[in-house]
Regions:
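Glycan-association/targeting regions that enable binding to alpha-glucans and other polysaccharides
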Residues: 10-117
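Sec-dependent bacterial lipoprotein signal peptides
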Residues: 1-10
Length: 117
């Protein structure tokens, strides 16, 4: 777990729940999952828009069923590629004087290795 400070003073911890190595599959789509904890009480949890970032491409994530702070999505890995580097970006709003304000946080970079043919 790595703590990443946000611009507005929130301590955020990402926990990557994705196996580092996955078997190659015919669909070329690989599941990734993360948990995010934030100490900021003013965070508007219903405003979170998480993404998986691979290079300059962003892939959407969905809330993990029955969990309050976990999200999951899929990373495409083309045939012949054995390593993908990715990170998570969470855009959200927090309550402030007046109206809610936007903010975001980014996880450390992770590596997914694909084995098999």
């Amino acid at each position: 777990v790595l703590l990443v400070p946000l611009l507005a003073g929130c301590a955020t911890a990402f926990t990557n729940l994705t196996p580092q190595i996955q078997e190659r599959n015919a669909a070329g789509q690989y599941p990734v999952e993360t948990a995010m904890d934030c100490s900021r009480q003013a965070l508007r949890w219903d405003s979170i828009q998480p993404k998986i970032i691979v290079g300059n491409q962003a892939y959407p994530m969905s809330p993990t069923p029955l969990m309050t702070n976990r999200w999951e999505g899929f990373v495409p890995v083309p045939p012949g590629t054995t390593t993908v580097r990715y990170h998570y970006k969470f855009d959200f709003e927090y309550n402030a004087f007046g109206k809610p304000k936007p903010d975001s946080t980014v996880s450390p970079e992770y590596t997914l290795r694909i084995k098999g043919q």
